Curated annotation (Swiss-Prot):
Protein's name in the database: Chaperonin 60 subunit beta 1, chloroplastic
The keyword rRNA processing appears for this protein: no
Species, as recorded: Arabidopsis thaliana
GO cellular component entries: apoplast; chloroplast; chloroplast envelope; chloroplast stroma; cytosolic ribosome; nucleus; stromule
Note: Assisted protein folding requires ATP hydrolysis, but not K(+) ions.
InterPro entries: Chaperonin_Cpn60_CS, Cpn60/GroEL, Cpn60/GroEL/TCP-1, GroEL-like_apical_dom_sf, GROEL-like_equatorial_sf, TCP-1-like_intermed_sf
Keyword flag Zinc: no
Gene transcribed to yield this protein: CPN60B1
Length: 600
């Protein structure tokens, strides 16, 4: 088998570090040693004798307050740009694209990522507040614009106080303590989301789009709250929803070199084959037969094993990077006996055979007959989703029945919980929402809205819901006075007052985007003691927002508050900025033949 592998030019040539095909001497060496030594895959670079040149830096001290003002100018430019998208009557932002048509977006974090300011100090300020949006997007998937606006409020109110001579260390400590206490109050205001409210949560996040809200709620009802819902770009102008058999688990790719989409940092394969191995893969030679079949068949292959040792992994990575194989690998989910059970579940879903030595199957003799089939595979750094091709539904039903019998026999609650998780992964399937639009530009913008709505719905399922429209943050401001009594000194209490004033910024901006005076709206909302009472910017009415379906996920509001406070703390504690001095661009050298009498 080793000789077959090395003789195959598509794989055997991968071992040679200089990129040329292996000669006979190299093949003979490989046949007598372990395949693909580390130094042959990743040769050690020669030590360079050239000196490292460091770019000069420019220092900006905040002696007269100009540096902080420039940082704040960057914050305000980014926040004002992102802020136009906030609320049901927020507008879109058009982003220039160097290649292709311009992008029209209504998503805060997408806009924030595109901003690069010419002034280096202002650009650092924009980058600081961008962190609030990015972190909120990572954890909650929605609320990015609110995070930026709230951070702008914290910074604006904080800069005024610090400029007046307050101690920024104690001020930021007060902000931190107040934000932490308000998170506790927020959880008290939260309620568990009902099935009938899921559509409202999604619709609000999608800019009051009821069609998107109802579709996401329908998807949740089909696969369950813990089911998996994914998005695809459709080929028609209409949105579509369908459910296919699938499974998701908390294991990501072993190496980032397997990534096929560098923007999302994910691996995506269609019509993929799966190799399941219930042991550690130590030698790449054992995979020769399976890999050669994959090359001849031209299909992508996913390897799921207990682990893959470094030398074998390096061989797979090099083959992938050179385009020889469409391949990815991940560690099997679970540990011990549960790991074997998960592998069996995946095998039944995909029609694969698990390679186990105790049943007489060895990896080096395995062929394509042991491979499973998946219509789609998506791997990220932390999760993996496998969508079956629908040909194993009868086997899946039998497997679910077996697991239900095990639940009846189980004595411990933990064991029952894990068995129920396996049933959900097997029988819940994957709901796929195909987003349709008339043009590519509209499709990109619409997909971002649906993605935000889906993330908001998942966040609502996790931690519950609160009143939306910026009213919950405004109501939290009334809790600050009680929190101030627990703080240690007057300057920390000033920090609490900063939080209190900043909490009204999102509601005021929502009202402003709807063409209404934000201060008037804020006062009218607070004049009513009913916590559900607020301003519906979509209709222009003051009403019970919970009954009107204006709902925010608690997790989103919590992340906005925590991350905005964190960014403000970092900003207010800054007193000096270091930036690189931009080197002047070289003047293009003219043609020495011009005007010499010899040119034409």
């Amino acid at each position: 088998m080793a000789s077959t592998f090395t003789a195959t030019s598509s794989i055997g040539s991968m071992v040679a570090p200089n990129g040329h095909k292996s000669d006979k001497k190299l093949i003979s060496k490989l046949s007598s040693s372990s395949f693909g030594r580390r130094q042959s895959v990743c040769p050690r670079p020669r030590r360079s004798s050239s000196a490292i040149v460091c770019a000069a830096k420019e220092l900006h001290f905040n002696k007269d307050g100009t540096t902080i003002r420039r940082l704040q100018a960057g914050v305000n430019k980014l926040a004002d740009l992102v802020g136009v998208t906030l609320g049901p009557k927020g507008r879109n932002v058009v982003l220039e694209s160097k290649y292709g048509s311009p992008r029209i977006v209504n998503d805060g974090v997408t806009v924030a990522r595109e901003v690069e300011l010419e002034d280096p100090v202002e650009n650092i300020g924009a980058k600081l507040v961008r962190q609030a949006a990015a972190k909120t997007n990572d954890l909650a998937g929605d609320g990015t614009t609110t995070s930026v606006v709230l951070a702008q409020g914290f910074i604006a109110e904080g800069v005024k106080v610090v400029a007046a001579g307050a101690n920024p260390v104690l001020i930021t400590r007060g902000i931190e303590k107040t934000a932490k206490a308000l998170v506790t109050e927020l959880k008290k205001m939260s309620k568990e989301v009902e099935d009938s409210e899921l559509a409202d949560v999604a619709a609000v996040s999608a800019g009051n789009n009821d069609e998107i809200g109802n579709m996401i709620a329908e998807a949740m009802s089909k696969v369950g709250r813990k089911g998996v819902v994914t998005l695809e770009e459709g080929k028609s102008a209409e949105n579509n929803l369908y459910v296919v058999e699938g499974m998701q688990f908390d294991r990501g790719y072993i190496s980032p070199y397997f990534v096929t989409d560098s923007e999302k940092m994910s691996v995506e394969f269609d019509n993929c084959k799966l190799l399941l191995v219930d042991k550690k893969i130590t030698n790449a030679r054992d995979l020769v037969g399976v890999l050669e079949d994959a090359i001849r068949g031209g299909y992508p292959i996913l390897i799921i094993a207990e682990d893959i040792e470094q030398e074998a992994l390096a061989t797979l990575v090099v083959n992938k990077l050179r385009g020889t194989l469409k391949i990815a690998a991940l560690r099997a989910p679970g540990f011990g006996e549960r790991k074997s059970q998960y592998l069996d579940d995946i095998a039944i879903l995909t029609g694969a055979t698990v390679i186990r030595e105790e049943v007489g199957l060895s990896l080096d003799k395995a062929g394509k007959e042991v491979l499973g089939n998946a219509s789609k595979v998506v791997l990220t750094k932390e999760t993996s989703t496998i969508v079956g091709d629908g040909s194993t539904q009868d086997a899946v039903k039998k497997r679910v029945t077996q697991i239900k019998n095990l639940i009846e026999q189980a004595e411990q609650d933990y064991e029952k919980e894990k068995l129920n998780e396996r049933i959900a992964k097997l029988s819940g399937g994957v709901a796929v929402i195909q987003v349709g639009a008339q043009t590519e530009t509209e499709l990109k913008e619409k997909k971002l809205r649906v993605e935000d709505a889906l993330n908001a719905t998942k966040a609502a399922v996790e931690e519950g819901i609160v009143v939306g429209g910026g009213c919950t943050l405004l109501r939290l401001a009334s809790k600050v006075d009680a929190i101030k009594a627990t703080l240690d000194n007057d300057e920390e209490k000033v920090g609490a007052d900063i939080v209190k004033r900043a909490l009204s910024y999102p509601l005021k901006l929502i009202a402003k985007n709807a063409g209404v005076n934000g201060s008037v709206v804020s006062e009218k909302v607070l004049s009513n003691d009913n916590v559900k009472f607020g301003y519906n910017a979509a209709t222009g009415k003051y009403e019970d927002l919970m009954a009107a379906g204006i709902i925010d996920p608690t997790k989103v509001v919590r992340c906005c508050l925590e991350h905005a406070a964190s960014v403000a703390k970092t900003f207010l504690m800054s007193d000096c900025v270091v930036v690189e001095i931009k080197e002047p661009e070289p003047v293009p050298v003219g043609n020495p033949m011009d005007n010499s009498g010899y040119g034409y």
